[in-house]
Structures are given as C-alpha cells and as structure tokens.
Amino acid sequence: KNCFLFRKSFMKKIAIIGAGISGLFAANLFSKNSDYQVMIYEKNNSIELDEGYGIQLSTNSIKLLNNIGFNKLEDIDQFNPEQIDFYDLKNQKKICELNISKFNTENCKYTALKRSKLVKFLKNRLDNQVIKYGHNIQKIEKKDDQVVLSFKENSEKVVCDILIISDGI
C-alpha cells in the first residue's frame, strides 16, 4: 500500500515597517523559520552605518541576540563593563554605583558597543532583497485576514499576513 502524507503549509508574509535595530532584529528572527517570508520597508534610501554613538545592551537583550548568532561577534567590537557609576549633572558628584557584572552569565554579559556595529551585524545576516528602501508608508488597511500597505512613492500595494511596525516613532 502506498501512503502519502501531505502537509498543507502556507508561508506567512511578514511586512516590517522600519529598518532600525528592532526591525532588523525581528526580520532576523523570522528569517530563521521557513514558514515566514519577511520584507522590511524602510522610508530612507539606505541604513546609516556611520560610527556614531555607543549603546548598552542588558543581559536579557544579549540572550535574545545570541539566538541569531550575536555571540559570534568579535570581542574587539564590544565591551563588557563591570559597573555603572551615576553622577549628578549639576555638581558632577557621584551618586551611586551599580555592579552590573552580577547579572552576567557565561554567555550573556552586559555589553556596550557602537550602534553601527550592531546595525551592521543585523543587516549583514539578511539577504539583500529583504530590505526595500525608499518605501514611505501612506496607508495601512485591514482586508479580511490580511493587511494591505500603500506607499507614498508609488502605486505599489503590498499584502501581508502579519505587520510589525518598528519605525521608531
């Protein structure tokens, strides 16, 4: 006897508005699963990768980032401070200190790094076709079980099953 098992599978289309850190992170998470097709719509014509300023990442955020390979980032690109000192801005006197190393584990350490390093890491893990630049959202409509996106720049309409808005506003 022949027996065939057919899995009825529908790839869910995910649209992400905004190619900042949160949008890029979400795209990385969903891209790991073949049940999802991910597309990021960014209003700017590129992602700013200037050296810029530093950011601090808690151990909880490092744990999430490690799910997409952050732990493979070179040590030279990051710093793991042991404590944070708090100062009064008016008189510049130290108010207190926080020993953050006690929150660290072997694989999840409080981390400081340049924002551009994190953005490059997140962007470089995605296929080039995942980010559509120059797409400024004009209208979002719900139609049955889907979402329809319209853009200011053209008459293109995008239909998706899941919409993630992470435009920083």
Specify the residue positions occupied by each region the protein language model found.
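Short, Lys/Arg-enriched N-terminal segments with co-localized hydrophobic residues
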Residues: 1-10
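Active-site loop of classical SDR/Rossmann-like NAD(P)-dependent oxidoreductases
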Residues: 53-57
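Glycine-rich FAD pyrophosphate-binding loop
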Residues: 31-51
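Beta1/beta-strand and adjacent pyrophosphate-binding region of the FAD-binding site
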Residues: 11-22
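Conserved N-terminal helical subregion
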Residues: 14, 31, 58-169
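Short beta-strand/turn micro-motifs composed of small residues
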Residues: 18, 42, 165
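Conserved SAM/SAH-binding loop-helix junction
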Residues: 25
